[in-house]
Amino acid sequence: MTETFIHLDKVRKSYRTRDEDFLAVSDVTLDIDEGELVALVGPSGCGKSTLLKILAGLHGFDSGKVDIGNPANPFIPGRDIGMVFQQPLLLKWRRIIDNVVLPAEILGLPKKETYERARELLQMVGLGGFESKYPYELSGGMQQRAAIARSLVHNPKLVLMDEPFGALDALTREKMNLELLRIWEESKKTIIFVTHGIQEAVFVGSKVVVLSSRPARMVDHFKVDLPYPRNLDMKTHEAFGDYTRRIYKLLGMQ
């Protein structure tokens, strides 16, 4: 039986500006199991990224509880987390492999083993042979693949992805969704994937969490009962349409 890996209980987060206070996240309660690929979907600006930053330990929160890990699989903040952002954020003066090893380098992990793992990860994300290239020599999609490899190099237990394919063209985005699913099935990591794309959420997620407009409240969450490995033909299936219509309805768009 799969154990709960992340538990949020009535998490609340507000911000103070010069003119006013505003609530970004309101009483979110959620359980995520080990090895799930959870898609967080909601309108732009609703607080999805704020929730992700709370999980990453980059933001505090006003009240509630956040537990990550369990007795069988303890979690070390900072060490056991990987992040992928909307932009690849590769250092232009470092080769691709030197960008990939950066988190492990910061953590002081053994250099030889780190570079071996980086080469394996670049192979896994389809960038074998590009180790010595520089970021400007790669397309946007290839740079984002390198960013995914970088997020995995220190073998984190949790990977947080904040609209990682939002800046890509539609065709490259579809390819990257397929790539993400393949990487997830190979790595068995717990992944939280933020998107405002409803079809994208259903396609990549083993579970979908639907958030309201700001402040982010959890409207619903459900398992996506579509088989793996997934392919683009699934978007024509009746069940896929049912899931997307469910989300549209939950967001008041139908």
Region locations from a protein language model:
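The feature captures the beta-strand-to-loop junction immediately N-terminal to the Walker
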Residues: V41-P43
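Helix-to-loop junction immediately C-terminal to a conserved catalytic motif
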Residues: A56
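Conserved ABC transporter NBD signature motif
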Residues: G64-P77
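Short coil-to-helix segment of the ABC ATPase nucleotide-binding domain corresponding to the Q-loop/switch region
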Residues: R94-V101
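Conserved ABC ATPase "signature" region
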Residues: V101, E105, K112-F130, R182
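Conserved signature/switch motifs of ABC ATPase nucleotide-binding domains
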Residues: K133-Y136, H154
